[in-house]
Amino acid sequence: MGEAPGITAQRNEHITNPANGELDMLFLFEHVDFDCEDNVKWKPLPLDLPQLKRIFAKQQSAVKNAGWASLFTGNHDQPRVVSRWGDDSTEGSRVRSAKALGLMLHMHRGTPYVYQGEELGMTDVHFTRLDQYRDLESLNAYRQRVEEAKVQSAESMMAGIAARGRDNARTPMQWDGSAYAGFTAPDAAVEPWISVNRNHTQINAAGEFDDPDSVYTFYKRLIAIRHENALVAAGDWQLIDADDQYVYAFTRTLGGEKLLVAVNLSGRTVDLPRDAAELVQHGVTEPDIVISTYDASHAVVSLANRELGPWEGAAVRV
């Protein structure tokens, strides 16, 4: 496994091709580097879904015949994906969007990577003061851009650090709702090096393990499906409608089997892309639903209406 900033999708195919004896997988970064103004990390932009789809399409197409893809949206250098591309403003939208983003990623062809806390829907830390941060990249960037070069206002820079700073992914893992989230004993003499996310009393592993509707339970199902279903593990990947602003849709095919994956990455009800709607025009039943972010009965109704609810996604046999 290699970390490969600057490596193209085409080069990834060569490096990960077993015949070349180099590496099994690479982390490519174009899909987590594009959503900022003028290539400045501290000037984040809203998600451009068509652009994200095109980047993933390049990565998927490059390894269609040889090589392999690494699937990730989070790591120790990236903000929490549910805060970045989802909606963590309410508990309901956090859970729904975390599931939608997980479904979108895990249904691609490749090996998914789950960064600690992603399976719980952990959010950005939402610090409001510079002295709460510990990452030198953020602290140095503030000094250089605000105090020395004066190319960015303090308010804009703090917003940029809050949205893209690496400390978002580096707060203690939220194991439970105790004082330090179970990372260390609640009565420990020494506090963790950085503050625990304040929402750890609501978002933690202990609270999600036995909840059938939790993000954690959904991720367990996503991982199980990849082991159970050869179509998900190895099927060919084909994008549907790169230009749709809200729905990320694609198919997986293997032999005579086909799976439609359609995920609404917005907080509104939207129409299915035409080509996706045509695949379900004769209707689907609950047994056809492999997995969905709502329940299967809701997915059946949504697909019959050729639409998806807020943050609704489904993988369905067609």
Predicted regions and their residues:
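Active-site and adjacent substrate-binding regions of carbohydrate-active enzymes
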Residues: M1-V318
